[in-house]
Amino acid sequence: MKKPTLLIVFLTVFIDVVGFSIIFPLFPAMLDYYLKLDGKESLIGSLVAWLDQFAGGDTNAVATLFGGVVGSLYGFLQFVFAPIWGAYSDRHGRRPTLIFTLGGIVLANLIWVFAGSFALLVLGRALGGIMAGNISTASAVAADITSGKNRASGMILIGVALGLGFILGPAIGGFAYSWQLVEAGEAAT
């Protein structure tokens, strides 16, 4: 078992999941921020009007639906691109695929953190979902570098990275918001 490679696999999955989940506690504040910034006649204004039809005027329900829509975009694209990145890594190698997609995740997170409009937030989340399809490639790397009797350890490492990412991502997002570290969007505009 190659421990440095497994560490890279762990970090890839962990960073992917933190990037996915860090935004969860920020959705209500982002809804207010981008609605004020872009206005009711914008993309976000149209989305809020559409969600309001389902929520019956309940502001909390609109914020919840907003989080669901924006959050599911990432997950949907991750689902669609997982087999694409898997096939790409079979042809071009696991390492270049992981390096490229991890760089894409970092870029995607920077885009949404500094987004000066809702459209840029959506672009960042979409790019993140596309690049996060690399979790299947990371799992393949773990399987490739572990022998049959050690393969369970490699898969457990993937599970631990997923679990820790889902635990720490929302916590980091919540703390960043409570400490007012998430005013980067306002600084970028």
Describe each PLM feature range.
Residues K3-S46:
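Pair of pore-lining "gating" transmembrane helices in MFS-fold secondary transporters
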